[in-house]
């Protein structure tokens, strides 16, 4: 199959799927190896991002999705009756930052770092699909572990968790959480 045909098929798959489409699924359908598929997708992403189009292809944790370009949000939003979600609280941003940099992590460890109860923030972040349960720790009581989701990556504009800004600290307990929250907010508002 020619590259141009493969690109057309990939474009159709990503568009039709709606949600982020896993690379493995693309490879399976087109019978491609991952290296070849990644190369083709990279070329497609570059083409979309650098052309005079209203859409782009985004990579999120080795999944691909078509999205409208951020600069056209004001126009796209008029198409929908967007229900404004209440902004996350300071506590929720703090918990989100702690989880992002320490995942998987237990609620007890989150509370130890923050020094206060974090039940409400964890519940709200779970409801927003920014964090999820990631199993249970193999210790007495089997506490739940939490990690960030693909939705977290999408909202903050990261391809993977490795794209988080590096912290210049040795101990998260010494971190000024306000600075980290502001850094997260800047990343999410690109």
From Swiss-Prot:
InterPro entries xref list = ScpB_csome_segregation, WH-like_DNA-bd_sf, WH_DNA-bd_sf
Superkingdom assignment: Bacteria
Its principal location? Answer: cytoplasm
Single GO BP term: cell division
Q: Is Protease given among the entry's keywords?
A: no
Location relative to the cell: Cytoplasm
* Keywords, comma-separated and alphabetical: Cell cycle, Cell division, Chromosome partition, Cytoplasm
Similarity comment text for this entry: Belongs to the ScpB family.
Q: How does it assemble?
A: Homodimer. Homodimerization may be required to stabilize the binding of ScpA to the Smc head domains. Component of a cohesin-like complex composed of ScpA, ScpB and the Smc homodimer, in which ScpA and ScpB bind to the head domain of Smc. The presence of the three proteins is required for the association of the complex with DNA.
- Role: Participates in chromosomal partition during cell division. May act via the formation of a condensin-like complex containing Smc and ScpA that pull DNA away from mid-cell into both cell halves.
Q: Which PANTHER family match?
A: SEGREGATION AND CONDENSATION PROTEIN B
Protein name per UniProt: Segregation and condensation protein B
Organism equals: Ruminiclostridium cellulolyticum (strain ATCC 35319 / DSM 5812 / JCM 6584 / H10)
């Amino acid at each position: 199959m020619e590259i141009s045909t493969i690109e057309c098929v990939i474009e159709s798959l990503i568009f039709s799927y709606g949600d982020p489409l896993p690379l493995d699924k693309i490879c399976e359908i087109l019978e491609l190896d991952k290296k070849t598929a990644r190369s083709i997708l990279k070329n497609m992403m570059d083409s979309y991002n650098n052309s005079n189009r209203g859409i782009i292809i985004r990579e999120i944790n080795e999944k691909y999705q078509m999205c409208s370009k951020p600069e056209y949000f004001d126009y796209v939003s008029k198409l929908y009756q967007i229900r404004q979600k209440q902004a996350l609280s300071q506590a929720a941003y703090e918990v989100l930052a702690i989880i992002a940099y320490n995942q998987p992590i237990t609620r007890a460890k989150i509370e130890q770092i923050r020094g206060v109860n974090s039940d409400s923030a964890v519940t709200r972040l779970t409801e927003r699909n920014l964090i999820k349960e990631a199993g249970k720790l193999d210790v007495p009581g089997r506490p739940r572990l939490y990690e960030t989701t693909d939705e977290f990556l999408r909202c903050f504009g990261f391809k993977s968790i490795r794209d988080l800004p590096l912290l210049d600290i040795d101990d998260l307990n010494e971190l000024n959480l306000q600075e980290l929250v502001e850094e997260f907010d800047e990343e999410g508002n690109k």
